[in-house]
Amino acid sequence: MIRALAFSLALVFLASAQGCMFVNIPLTFPPTDYQEVMVQDGNRGEKILLLDIDGFLTSGKRSETPFVGLRDSTVNEVADRLAKAKDDRHIKAVVLRINSPGGGVTASDLLHNEVRKFKEETGLPVYASLLDMGTSGAYFVATSADEIYVHPTTVTGSIGVVSMFPQFEDLGHKIGVYVEVLKSGDNKDITGGFRNMTDSQREILQGMIDSLYERFLAAVLAGRPGLEADTLREIADGRIYTAEQSVEKGLTDGVMYLTDVLDHVREDIGAPDGRVIMYRRTSERSYDSVYASSDVRPTAELPRTPSASGTTINLLNVDLQSLWPDQRPVFYYVWLP
């Protein structure tokens, strides 16, 4: 594949030098089926699945973004991997390797539900290991695990909901721009931003945020039965916690490096020589560590752009519209540092 890519790029530069032809070389490849990769050796029997949940948590259809090409949503990726794990009788436990600030409320909720269903259908234990961060929606997902462990430098917590609604009415008055909105009811454009919110409209949105916050608390209480509801409300004011603080507050079970978590899981399931596997989509990358990424993102496309003088080859075509998904969530379980 690398040789073919080098040859294709050579053709691009030759064509560009001649200025007489258009060349369009797509370098965005559709995802392939998942393949099993061993990241820690062991016996040929019991397996522990190491499953990544990283970055901003998303749901919905596959999207194409600049520089990285096609990418599935977090929910699709996790659901696909869990479905594959269900069919493997040698898998004895799952470790969620989480490194995320959170994301959309629905994405967080769907991920939580996927893990919960997997546990119910398979009877297998699930552990969560938080790395750099496991905040807000990422912590929401972690509560679906049987045990939660944090790296010594992990940032976690940030339990709560956030939503932002820019208001442009005052700015429009200053620059002489007015947007006429025709609507069927006073609250139809409540989040439109072209007119300032009224107090009653803020109450409507705050009520929705409060409801989603209660859902977050319920998930934590279900996953952390040792926590009292009153205690949780005191600590769930949106603040973040260090690893040690999260253990003291009862949000997590201990401070462990990922390798120590895996050893702990082996002991729990009675498989001291159990091997650790991941699922990935391509065969281009070697996996020699439990800290290696489980996915390789395809590269972006090399499009063509005609010009009046001949042929122009754009090696990087950045579509700003693709930086935002088609359907953005309104409410977030996310930490905004």
Predicted segments with their positions:
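Short gly/pro/ser/thr-enriched loop/turn and capping motifs at secondary-structure boundaries
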Residues: T135-S136, V155-I159
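N-terminal organellar transit peptides
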Residues: I2-L9, F13-G134, A145-H151, V162-P337
